[in-house]
Design a protein with these regions (language model features):
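NAD(P)-binding Rossmann-fold cofactor-contacting core
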Residues: 27-44, 164-181
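Short loop/helix-cap segments at secondary-structure boundaries that form the rim of catalytic
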Residues: 39-45, 96-102, 175-183, 195, ...
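Short, acidic/turn-prone active-site loops that include or flank metal/cofactor-
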Residues: 35-39, 92-94, 111-116, 173-176, ...
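Glycine-rich adenosine-cofactor-binding loop
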Residues: 8-20, 24, 141-162
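Rossmann-like adenosine-cofactor binding region
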Residues: 59-60, 68-87, 180-221
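Short acidic-hydrophobic, aromatic-tinged amphipathic segments that line or gate anion-handling sites
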Residues: 47-55, 108, 184-191
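Glycine/serine-rich phosphate-binding loop and adjoining beta1-alpha1 elements at the start
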Residues: 2-4, 62-81, 85-141
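N-terminal accessory targeting/assembly segments
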Residues: 4-5, 9-37, 45-51
Length: 221
């Protein structure tokens, strides 16, 4: 297989997908980019000079989606997908993997790669802390930080904050016996007193944790 002869279709509506599209173009790949993939019409599309709109998806070799990827969010595209497609994304739901297996569509879930998960967590942690520094007049050093969730990203964020001399507090429902020296651990957010006194709060939990009454308390800071 010569990848320069294959077609790559990138779906998504943020700068990461656009950056990936531009990277493929710079490398000479045959790529297209849609910013409107989760609606019933894909009109906002940019193409490389090899792509033709009358053949969208039906001959595409690689379909790259944002993470996470659920079947119901891209159902409008499935009539065009076929066994020659290769779906790439992450955190696929069971419905999507079952559909691909049933229709002999190849797929790859990036989150099945430990190296990808670790690298992605590091990059996400660095980006989150960088954004916090950019948008605050306070420094990380000497600050009081709360990290909600202690999965891959939460662990990396807490570790980096600690290295930058922040007082780190972590909320983790599945209490771990050890998460690092000098890190205060809470089982849930209701155990945290005076939440408004934290200088930085990083929410990595997959469920809604900062509910309205807590956000109202933060607004009074």
């Amino acid at each position: 297989m010569n990848i320069f002869d294959d077609r790559i279709y990138i779906f998504g509506d943020d700068s990461r997908q656009l950056a990936l599209f531009n990277l493929f173009l710079e490398k000479g790949y045959n790529a297209a980019y849609s910013t409107d993939c989760f609606s019933n019409n894909n009109k906002k599309i940019k193409y490389s000079h090899h792509f033709y709109e009358d053949n969208l998806c039906t001959g595409t070799d690689f379909l790259i989606f944002p993470i996470p990827l659920k079947k119901r969010s891209i159902d409008n595209l499935f009539p065009f997908a076929h066994k020659n497609n290769y779906i790439i994304g992450g955190l696929f739901d069971k419905e999507l993997t079952a559909f691909c297996n049933r229709n002999n569509i190849c797929y790859y879930d990036l989150y099945l790669s430990k190296n990808f998960v670790t690298s992605n967590a590091k990059i996400t942690a660095e980006g989150a802390i960088f954004c916090a520094m950019q948008n605050s007049t306070k420094t990380i050093a000497g600050s009081k930080s709360l990290v909600i969730g202690y999965g891959n990203c939460g662990c990396k964020i807490a570790g980096m904050l600690k290295c930058m001399n922040s007082e780190v507090h972590v909320i983790e429902p599945a209490k771990k016996t050890y998460i690092g020296r000098n890190i205060r651990l809470y089982k849930n957010i209701t155990e945290v007193r005076n939440i408004h006194r934290f200088d930085f709060i990083f929410n990595t939990a997959p469920q809604k944790t900062l509910v309205d009454d807590i956000l109202c308390r933060l607004k009074k800071m």
